[in-house]
Amino acid sequence: MLLMIDNYDSFTYNLVQYFGELKAEVKVVRNDELSVEQIEALAPERIVLSPGPCTPNEAGVSLAVIERFAGKLPLLGVCLGHQSIGQAFGGEVVRARQVMHGKTSPIHHKDLGVFAGLANPLTVTRYHSLVVKRESLPECLEVTAWTQHADGSLDEIMGVRHKTLNVEGVQFHPESILTEQGHELLANFLRQQGGVRGEGN
């Protein structure tokens, strides 16, 4: 079972629909509905942290879920969930250089993890005013996707993953109709097994 932590966001059920189309069994709980211990008792196979309107500090149980389950099962954070992953491992979440609400951007990626086999660059849809500050990214996380300036230098972080654990975040919305290959990205996450990355993950 895939457990979706709903950070009170209207996009959550679009994500649920996409995962359902990929034949995943999904259970949704609000971020203030269950404790970490109650979530553990549900014995999920994987957890997704949804988008939301706040910062990681107001995202209910999200940070505690990352701390408890990282290394035990696959975790994926989307938008706020991605920022929560960055913060949980020691990164800083700051205001983005440019607020993006319903705008598409081409992003570049390393063809790793959830980005494996996807178009590069990939057109994605962004709804966010916050980002993980790239200068603050902890040693244990690597940038897997980014936007670029005209000169090719890195602009904003669009994806991260833990270097040894099955923990990944994407700043954009794979469940948006305007995002290319959103189903394929989520299908890549569903293929991940266990908490520690091994061959084929």
Curated annotation (Swiss-Prot):
Description of what induces expression: Expression decreases as cell grow from early to late log phase and further decreases in stationary phase; there is about 5-fold less mRNA in stationary than early log phase.
Pathway membership: Amino-acid biosynthesis; L-tryptophan biosynthesis; L-tryptophan from chorismate: step 1/5
One annotated GO biological process: tetrahydrofolate biosynthetic process
Binding residues annotated for L-glutamine, in chain numbering: 52-54, 83, 129-130
Keyword hit for Lyase: yes
Superkingdom of this protein's organism: Bacteria
EC number: 4.1.3.27
NCBIfam families: PRK08857.1, trpG_papA
PANTHER family hit by this protein: MULTIFUNCTIONAL TRYPTOPHAN BIOSYNTHESIS PROTEIN, MULTIFUNCTIONAL TRYPTOPHAN BIOSYNTHESIS PROTEIN-RELATED
UniProt-recorded name of the protein: Anthranilate synthase component 2
Annotated gene: trpG
